[in-house]
From Swiss-Prot:
DNA-dependent RNA polymerase catalyzes the transcription of DNA into RNA using the four ribonucleoside triphosphates as substrates. Disulfide bonds: none annotated. GO terms for molecular function: DNA binding; DNA-directed RNA polymerase activity; ribonucleoside binding. This is DNA-directed RNA polymerase subunit beta. HAMAP family: RNApol_bact_RpoB (MF_01321). InterPro entries: DNA-dir_RNA_pol_bsu_ext_1_sf (IPR042107), DNA-dir_RNA_pol_bsu_external_1 (IPR019462), DNA-dir_RNA_pol_su2 (IPR015712), DNA-dir_RNAP_su2_dom (IPR007120), DNA-dir_RNAP_su2_hyb_sf (IPR037033), RNA_pol_bsu_bac (IPR010243), RNA_pol_bsu_CS (IPR007121), RNA_pol_bsu_protrusion (IPR007644). PANTHER family: DNA-DIRECTED RNA POLYMERASE I SUBUNIT 2. The gene is rpoB. Belongs to the RNA polymerase beta chain family.
Length: 1172
């Protein structure tokens, strides 16, 4: 066991593997990507459209103007992050570009800086503030552009496969080359529409000579092989065939006949070069369809005819059409990534091409790379892809799998915003062009008026506000925040559709190892589509996920760290990080298990090429916080990972006694801690700020040139609301005079303790059934947890109201509210706004507001009052902001925004008032508790502590769990955690047990027995075979339970699913406008839906009157429910119900589809149902 520093705490770690590199910056992908967009991305987009000329036609080029973008400058944010949150603003920076305009006729030029617009700016916590709300842009996993060799799904069984080479661009038409083995012919499918003969396309691309075409697909026939020779009839000879004596048997271009086969069989010739059967068949089919005289122009016209039937084929139009599809950079873009992937994939085919077609030797082509740089397709790409299809026919195992991570790339924040910016700017380019054309001289041009800033800003803003990849940040706790920033999603624009995603896409793939977590993913419809990055994973310049490995040479581990993509990793044998290694770095065992491709092999240590860097390399941050993960079933580990993100920050935080060593890393990069920016000495600490005097490398205090001390001031956040209504409160954890190093924690945030993540509490648990109160995952808890406020959390709700201009005059914020008692107004100030510190309950007034009433219904008496008292006598309606049902708490802040002082608040709004109420939520029956192993349950009873089972020394346990929750769930990690937690408490230590490299049973139980023996708690356990169990006594009777019981300390969290927030009841409330039925849901103060199954239940009982009431007066019979109310008030019998509104709606809908529906009474008179 070794000591490790974790935040400001020391832990004892059971880990045996020392990772050669530290955990990387966990949010670096976001920051780097956005920074790259600002520094390079914007300019790249502008350069892409440069130069913009005033006229498209080449004739006037020398006369017009051309505009190009020289550089980009990013300004400073105008408001602070906190101001933007309070005033519901967007945190942005201004972007400027230097524009150069040249007069083409005189070559005169002007340079001027123009404003491009405001761009949302990333905060230091890698979030964006959009209209006051913190949002995160999630990384998207999409198919990489390039080339894929796949098999088309077979339509009927018994047919032979169709192999496809699929060119996938970033932008533009698809091209698919097909090898149909049913008729052994090559085809090209153009733009997912029509299939044409491949040779027709190749002829259009310049391969017009038939023999030249066939010689692209050569094959050697062994004359000694009788079977092959007999089956070569009909093939075309590609080289003159001569005997050793020089006699010419067959010329280049001859077709092999039966006679030639006999001649060849009787000669001494060993091999002949012929065209491949598939190529010959393709050419024959082409001739059969189009005749013998297909040259380049004819090929263009035939392709055009096929793709545009009905249009008159002209040669120029046909050429332009095909060139625009695949060979024009404006219409077709492979991108740098696509070209890189394609060159890599076709490298082997290119070498084979050089040997077969160009006659080079294997030695000459060894190591030769395919180095095409064009951003569009080339004829060579198409030839190599077609030739490779023949190889795929021979070796189907070399086909590509779509689900391999080597074929997927990550679109990061910067790239997603760049795509939007490019889209916005492409629209602006046309306007710039049009405006340029209107100017006649250079000195009259106003650069700023050329660029339409509005359309650019609008597109960017709509991306942040409406794109599914820009998400409202999950801020429940620091881990939720960190995980959200590291999320990968396969859905969204340009990605998969949730409904259409196959099982294979969602499944774990061997290429995910070390790149994507195989455990952390949602449980619902999104399972496998939304995932999380692994701890050490990062992204290369092309957007492919890479993960680090340690290089191994001849059985010895080196210091070299190599990052590999999923494609590169396929070629190496990689051993796990837990492989035993001696002090010199030599691998100890002679044979080692390694991963190679998708197999696990057992090889000599000298064959090992790489070693994993850490045992937790495979999992995400959330999952690597689960101790004893290796003892949990993956399904439960998934729940554990997801539920940690739902833990509510508690009033008093407590780090887990049994951690994994990742608690500090998770808290550090979550952005909720305050970290020291430089080395220094703490000079001042209070609840709101910390001041640190900087020191140099020698520990001396630093002063500036004026002799003033160089101070760093850290402002702390106090009781700030998060997106999920939890509370952010930062507390100092340093003292005056303390020396701090750079990146040391100096203040704790929500759910952190001494710099470590602290989502729950260490509580004493016992696994024993107790009177059925812990049946089916229910949890029995002790009153002690309430007395100590163990699971009490603070939540902050915000309520707002506006004073607007109405038709009848402005609304007024005032304490003078009609028909409200003084008692109700006692906490309002002179403006009618609640005072800070007031304790409020449901229906209390937070902001007094009155709205002018309509003049039409004034009585003569009111008119007299009006004429006497003027405006004061005006009738007003109470429209005050009140506390909603089920809420009680303390007002902690009030923000008032005035139109005159704070600028525009929106159309017609004069005042905006926001009231923040802090609500204390102790643990109650119905709240959800969970451990870190997917062991979740609901509190069923709170028992007095004297009734709880107790230990031999009289200590009552705090939580009683059902032992039946463990065996079937197979999350045994919780049992080991419980025992190690007890050992930690007894010895007052903090342990770290890293995932896949943690403590073993033999490390825990003997030590636990010794610690218990010292305190007399060993009753019920055996020294020779310790189990960690203890004899418990029932708190009510004092009698021992029949068997020893497992007891210990488990880390338990309170989740955001709080019963108090969900409980709801309605007697009377709002109704839906159309059907006049009660609304649904707590937010609308709605009722419970009485659905068809409930109707069946009442029908089964024969409760006719109850059923009638349910479907009419209690639902949507408007007149009926009013009559019932009157009858109840007057004490009369309840009248018969009328016609439900839903029936009227049905009749109206039938009339809407032109069906004339009428209603008649028993005597045949028509009834107007609107009056019923």
């Amino acid at each position: 066991m070794k000591e490790i520093k974790s935040g400001k705490r020391t832990r004892f770690s059971f880990g045996r593997v020392q990772a050669p590199i530290p955990v990387p910056n966990l949010v670096e992908i976001q920051t780097k990507s956005y920074q790259d967009f600002l520094e390079n991305g914007i300019l790249k987009v502008l350069k892409k459209f440069s130069p913009i000329t005033s006229s498209k036609s080449d004739l006037r080029k020398e006369k017009g103007f051309s505009l190009e973008f020289v550089s980009v400058r990013v300004g400073e944010p105008q408001n602070t992050v906190q101001e933007c949150k309070e005033r519901l603003l967007t945190y942005t920076v201004p972007v400027y570009t230097t524009v150069r305009i040249t007069d083409n006729s005189t070559n005169e030029m002007i340079e001027e800086e123009a404003f491009l617009g405001y761009l949302p700016y990333m905060t230091p916590r890698t979030t964006f503030i959009i209209n006051g709300a913190e949002r995160v842009v999630v990384n998207q996993l999409v198919r990489s552009p390039g080339i894929y060799f796949v098999e088309e799904p077979r339509k009927t069984s018994g047919t032979r496969p169709i192999y496809v080479a699929h060119f996938l661009p970033v932008r533009g038409a698809w091209l698919e080359i097909l090898l149909n083995l049913n008729d052994e012919v090559f085809y090209a499918r153009i733009d997912r529409k029509r299939r044409v003969n491949l040779f027709l396309l190749l002829k259009a691309l310049g391969y017009s000579d038939d023999l030249k075409l066939l010689s692209l697909f050569p094959q050697w026939i062994d004359v000694d092989d009788e079977y092959t020779l007999m089956h070569s009839e009909g093939l075309v000879v590609l080289e003159d065939v001569k005997t050793k004596s020089g006699e010419l048997i067959a010329k280049r271009g001859d077709v092999i006949t039966q006679g030639l086969i006999e001649k060849l069989a009787n000669s001494e010739i060993e091999k002949i070069k012929v065209a491949h059967r598939y190529a010959v068949n393709t050419l024959e089919k082409l001739k059969h369809t189009y005749g013998d005289d297909v040259e380049e122009n004819r090929a263009y016209i035939e392709i055009f005819r096929k793709l545009r039937p009905g249009e008159l084929p002209r040669i120029n139009a046909a050429k332009i059409f095909l060139n625009n599809l695949y060979f024009n950079e404006e219409r077709f873009e492979l991108s740098e990534v696509g070209r890189f992937k394609m060159n890599n994939r076709l490298e082997e085919a290119y070498r084979k091409y050089l040997i077969d077609v160009e006659g080079k030797s294997p030695e000459e082509v060894e190591g030769v790379k395919y180095t095409e740089t064009s951003n569009v397709l080339t004829p060579m790409d198409i030839v190599l892809a077609s030739r490779n299809l023949i190889e795929i026919d021979k070796h189907p195992g070399t086909m590509d799998t779509k689900d391999h991570l080597g074929n997927k790339r990550v679109r990061t924040v910067g790239e997603l915003i760049r795509i939007e910016f490019e889209r916005a700017f492409s629209k602006a380019v046309f306007m710039i062009q049009e405006k340029l054309a209107t100017y006649t001289s250079l000195d009259k041009i106003s650069v700023q008026s050329l660029i339409n800033v509005r359309s650019i800003i609008a597109t960017i803003n709509s991306f942040f506000a409406t794109n599914p990849l820009s998400q409202f940040m999950d801020q429940t706790n620091p881990l939720a925040e960190l995980t959200h920033k590291r999320r990968l999603t396969a859905v969204g624009p340009g990605g998969l559709k949730r409904e259409r995603a196959r099982f294979e896409v969602r499944d774990v793939h061997h290429s995910h190892y070390g790149r994507m977590c195989p455990i952390e993913t949602p449980e619902g419809a999104n399972i496998g589509l939304i995932t999380s990055l692994s701890v050490y994973s990062t992204i290369d310049k092309y957007g492919f996920l890479i993960t680090p490995y340690v290089k191994v040479v001849k059985g010895k581990v080196t210091d070299e760290i190599v990052y590999l993509t999923a494609d590169e990793e396929e070629n190496y044998k990689i051993a796990p990080s837990t492989t035993p290694v001696d002090e010199e770095g030599n691998i100890i065992p002679e044979n080692v298990t390694v991963r190679y491709e998708e197999k696990v092999l057992y090889v000599s240590k000298y064959d090992v090429q790489f070693l994993d860097v850490a045992p937790n390399q495979i999992v995400s941050v959330s999952t690597s916080l689960i101790p004893f993960l290796e003892h949990d079933d993956a399904n439960r580990a998934l729940m554990g990972s997801n539920m940690q993100r739902q833990g509510v920050p508690l009033i008093e935080t407590e780090a887990p006694r049994v951690g994994t060593g990742m608690e500090w890393e998770a808290a550090k990069y979550s952005g909720t801690l305050v970290l020291a920016k430089h080395d220094g000495i703490v000079k001042k600490v209070d609840a709101n700020k910390i001041i640190i005097h900087r020191i140099d490398e020698n520990g001396k205090e630093m002063y500036d040139s004026m002799g003033n001390p160089v101070l760093d001031t850290y402002e702390l956040l106090k009781f700030t609301r998060t997106n999920q209504d939890t509370c952010i409160n930062q507390r100092p954890i340093v003292n005056v005079g303390e020396v701090v190093k750079k990146d040391d924690p100096i203040a704790d945030g929500p759910a952190t303790d001494m710099g470590e993540l602290a989502l729950g509490k260490n509580v004493l648990v016992a696994f024993v059934p107790w009177e059925g109160y812990n049946f089916e995952d229910a949890i029995l808890i002790s009153e002690e947890l309430l007395e100590k406020e163990t699971y009490t959390s603070v939540h902050i709700e915000v309520y707002e109201t506006t004073a607007r201009d109405t038709r009848l005059g402005p609304e007024e914020i005032t304490p003078d509210i009609p028909n409200v008692s003084k008692e109700k107004l006692r906490n309002l100030d002179e403006d009618g706004i609640i005072r800070i510190g007031a304790y409020v309950q449901e229906t209390d007034i937070l902001v007094g507001k009155v709205t002018p009433k309509s003049e039409s219904d004034t009585t003569p008496e009111e008119k007299i009052i009006r004429s006497v008292f003027g405006e004061k006598g005006k009738e007003v309606k109470d429209s005050s902001l009140r506390v909603p049902h089920g809420i009680e708490g303390r007002v902690i802040a009030v923000h008032v925004f005035d139109k005159e002082k704070d600028g525009d608040l929106g159309p017609g709004v004069n005042k905006l008032i926001r009231v923040y109420v802090a609500i204390r939520k102790p643990l109650e029956v119905g709240d959800k508790l969970a451990g870190r192993h997917g062991n979740k349950g609901v509190v069923s009873k709170i028992l007095p502590k004297e009734d709880m089972p107790f230990l031999p020394d009289g200590t009552p346990v705090q939580v009683v769990l059902s032992p039946l929750g463990v065996p079937s769930r197979m999350n045994v990690g919780q049992i080991l955690e419980t025992s190690l937690g007890w050992l930690a408490m007894l010895t007052n230590k903090w342990f770290a047990t890293p995932v896949f490299d943690g403590a073993k049973e033999k490390d825990i139980l003997p030590e636990l027995y010794k610690a218990r023996k010292k305190l007399g708690l060993e009753v019920g356990d055996d020294e020779n075979n310790p189990t960690g169990k203890v004899t418990l006594r029932d708190g009510r009777t004092g009698l021992e339970f029949d068997h020893p019981i497992l007891v210990g300390y488990m880390y338990v969290m309170k989740l955001i699913h709080i019963a108090r927030d969900k409980i709801h009841a309605r007697s009377t409330g709002p109704y839906s406008l159309i059907h006049q039925q009660p609304l649904g849901g707590k937010a609308q103060f709605g009722g419970q839906r009485f659905g068809e199954m409930e109707v069946w239940a009442l029908e089964a009982y024969g409760a006719a009157h109850t059923l009638n009431e349910m479907l009419t007066v209690k639902s949507d019979d408007i007149m009926g429910r009013n009559e019932v109310y009157k009858a109840i008030m007057k004490g009369k019998n309840i009248p018969d119900p009328g016609l439900p509104e839903s029936f009227k709606v049905l009749v109206r809908e039938l009339r809407g589809i032109a069906l004339d529906v009428r209603v008649y009474d028993s005597e045949g008179n028509e009834i107007d149902i609107e009056k019923l």
